[in-house]
Amino acid sequence: MSYYREPTYLISFMFRRILVPIDGSASSLKALDIALDFAKRYGSKLTALVVNDKTINVEEVSGEVSSRARKSGIEVVLKIKDVRNPNESVVSKVLEEISEGSYDLVILGARGRTLSEDLLIGSTALSIIINSPVSCLVVR
């Protein structure tokens, strides 16, 4: 196996627009950090999506996203979507944004804020991965 010091330009062409769903959990913030690194190395455009399902503090999560983006020197578009009725879910809002935004990659945390540490992947992440029309990178 050989190691290349030159950047791989294939990644910069494949993953130009990246979506990062954020719920404030440790794994979603880790996903944001990885996405920021992608943007720094490959020039990707980042969008952070916070879905307000009334269980998270949107202002706190938005502030954390802005703080990390500012520290890294990368511009991040922050979108907030609300779950307005019982027929909508976090998953449906994320998938809706993927379709509307023409993203190339979704980087998401494996587990949300409420799941047991015994689980390797949460139901929301799994549903997004299964139904996403684009590539997904799952961060543990």
Where are these regions (language model features)?
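Gly/Ser-rich helix-loop-strand patches that form or flank binding pockets
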Residues: 1-4, 98-140
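Structural motif
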Residues: 10, 37, 97-98, 129
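A structural preference for short, hydrophobic beta-strand core positions in alpha/beta folds
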Residues: 48, 78-82, 138
